[in-house]
From Swiss-Prot:
This is Formamidopyrimidine-DNA glycosylase. The active site is at 2 (schiff-base intermediate with dna), 3 (proton donor), 57 (proton donor), 260 (proton donor). The keyword Lyase applies. The lineage of its organism: Bacteria, Pseudomonadati, Pseudomonadota, Gammaproteobacteria, Alteromonadales. Involved in base excision repair of DNA damaged by oxidation or by mutagenic agents. Acts as a DNA glycosylase that recognizes and removes damaged bases. Has a preference for oxidized purines, such as 7,8-dihydro-8-oxoguanine (8-oxoG). Has AP (apurinic/apyrimidinic) lyase activity and introduces nicks in the DNA strand. Cleaves the DNA backbone by beta-delta elimination to generate a single-strand break at the site of the removed base with both 3'- and 5'-phosphates. Its EC number is 3.2.2.23, 4.2.99.18.
Length: 271
C-alpha cells in the first residue's frame, strides 16, 4: 500500500506537468473505485490547475472551482503519459491536459478514490480530523508524549493512527520502532519521554530518507515515470520475519498487531 513517502514522490513527479495547465477532459472508464467517482468531479474540466499538494496519503489537485482528492488505495498509481496512449487494463481515469499529456490513474484492486471537493478541503470528512504531518514542526516529542498519555494501546497502533499523526503506515512504523529500540507492543502511555524523543526523530529521518530514495517498492508501487522506489533495499525489519537482525544477529520475530504484519527484534526492542 502506498504510504506517505510514495504519495509525496508521486506529488513531486506529477506537479511540474499539472501546475498552470488547463484540464480539457476527465475520462472515467470505471467509476467503481472505493467510492464511486462522482459526476461532479467533471467540474474540473476547463479549469487551470493552481497547485498539487499532499495531505496525509491524499493527493490534492487545486483549481479555482474546487479540489480533486485522490487516494491511491492498496495498489493505485499515477503516471504522466501522452494523452493518446491506449489505455491498458486497470487504467480507470485520465485527467487530460491542454499540453497533450494526461494524468492516468491505474488501480488493479480498486481500493483507491477520485473525489471532488468544493469546500475548503479541511472541511472534507476524509481530511477534517487528521493529525499533524510527521515532517512538520507540529509533530514533535512534547506533542506525541501528550497524545499518548494514559493510552493502553500498543505503541505501533498509535503510531499508525491518523488522528495522532498522519502517513506513518505499516512499513515505516515497523522501521521507526526498530530504529528507536521500542517494542511494537509496548503500552503507548508508558513509553518514556526520552524514547519518545528518539522515536519522533527516527520517524522524520526514515520518512525523509524514503522520499529521497523514491519510496518503497514491494509489489505495486511505481512513481510517476514508472520507475520503482529503492527504499526497500534499506528495510531492517519489515518483510524480514524469521531472518537475522541487522543489528545483533538475533532472529527477528513476526506477529500480527491490528491485523498487520509486525516484525521486531526481541533483543534490540524492549518493552
Amino acid at each position: 500500500m502506498p504510504e506517505l513517502p510514495e504519495v509525496e514522490v508521486t506529488r513531486q513527479g506529477v506537479s511540474p506537468y499539472l501546475i498552470d495547465n488547463t484540464v480539457t477532459d476527465l475520462i472515467v472508464r470505471n467509476p467503481s473505485l472505493r467510492w464511486p467517482v462522482p459526476e461532479i468531479a467533471k467540474q474540473i474540466i476547463g479549469q487551470t490547475i493552481r497547485n498539487v499538494r499532499r495531505r496525509a496519503k491524499y493527493l490534492l489537485i487545486d483549481t479555482d472551482a474546487g479540489t480533486t482528492i485522490v487516494h491511491l488505495g492498496m495498489s493505485g498509481s499515477l503516471r504522466i503519459l501522452p494523452a493518446t496512449t491506449p489505455a491498458e487494463k486497470h487504467d480507470h481515469i485520465d485527467l487530460v491536459l491542454a499540453s497533450g499529456k494526461a494524468l492516468r490513474f491505474n488501480d488493479p484492486r480498486r481500493f483507491g478514490a477520485w473525489l471532488w471537493c468544493e469546500l475548503p478541503e479541511q472541511a472534507h470528512p476524509l481530511l477534517s480530523k487528521l493529525g499533524p504531518e510527521p515532517l512538520t514542526d507540529a509533530f514533535n516529542a512534547p506533542y506525541l508524549l501528550e497524545s499518548l498519555a494514559n493510552k493502553k494501546k500498543a505503541i505501533k497502533l498509535c503510531l499508525m493512527d491518523n488522528h495522532i499523526v498522519v502517513g506513518v503506515g505499516n512499513i515505516y512504523a515497523n522501521e521507526a520502532l526498530f530504529a528507536a529500540g521500542i517494542h511494537p507492543q509496548a503500552e503507548a502511555g508508558k513509553v518514556d519521554a526520552e524514547r519518545i524523543e528518539i522515536l519522533v526523530s527516527e520517524v522524520k529521518q526514515i520518512l525523509a530518507g524514503a522520499i529521497k530514495q523514491g519510496g518503497t517498492t514491494l509489489k505495486d508501487f511505481t512513481n510517476a515515470d514508472g520507475k520503482p522506489g529503492y527504499f526497500a533495499q534499506k528495510l531492517h525489519v519489515y518483510g524480514r520475519g524469521g531472518k537475522t537482525c541487522t543489528q545483533c544477529g538475533h532472529m527477528l520475530s513476526e506477529i500480527k498487531l491490528g491485523q498487520r504484519a509486525t516484525v521486531f527484534c526481541s533483543l534490540c526492542q524492549q518493552r
